[in-house]
Amino acid sequence: MPLRVTFVAAARSSSLHAERFEDDRPLDQAGWNEVLGASPALLPLAAAELRYCAPTPRSRATGDALGYAPLVQLALRDCDMGRWRGLTLGEAMAREPSAVDAWLADPRGAPHGGESLLAFIARVGGWLDTRPVDDSGLIVAVAEPAVIRAALVYALRVPLSTYWSLDVRPLSAVALIGSGGRWNLRFEGVRAQPSGV
């Protein structure tokens, strides 16, 4: 029987325009308000047999607020951004423009001294493919948007450059149905958000 792994994007901890690499900040008031607003649509996922989350404070808080009581999975951590950790993309670009350009152009490169995009996607995909087959049924995982993008690129076997074209919004949900390297994408009830947020 195939698995159904539903990814829920963690609520935000800042304006989406101020997102930082490997952001360890807790949910802000806007994030908490968004969780409360989205909870009617996302609470039913608490019935999943297995409930996981990334180790970030906002992933754990989102999962707890939705009643998932998730188990932290280190493999669902955000991409290791090395010396760019805590910076916005604009800040990294201002400090090291050629390194950022190289990182965006080459998924195998890690000019920041951390993890390459290729290694990050492989790590997240490895977690996805090692879900035990006898755990058939429902799995929910609260994670950072970057982790969900990595899971989608891996599962759908699309070009790595597709990663940059996926826009995973806070508290959106998407499901992957399948197992062992054969996955299908299913869109869940994604909460509409005002444009420009």
Model-identified regions with their sequence ranges:
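Acidic, low-complexity terminal tails and accessory targeting/binding regions
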Residues: 1-4, 73, 79-91, 153-197
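Active-site-proximal alpha-helix that buttresses catalytic centers in soluble enzyme cores
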Residues: 2-71, 113
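Generic beta-sheet signal
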Residues: 5, 49, 135-146
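Phosphate-handling substructures
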Residues: 26, 66-125, 165, 187
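Generic structural signal for well-ordered alpha-helical scaffold segments
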Residues: 36-43, 121, 125-133
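Conserved histidine-centered catalytic loops in small-molecule metabolism enzymes
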Residues: 45-75, 101, 177-197
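Short beta-strand scaffold positions
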Residues: 53-54, 122, 142-143
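GST superfamily/GST-like fold recognition
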Residues: 145-149, 178
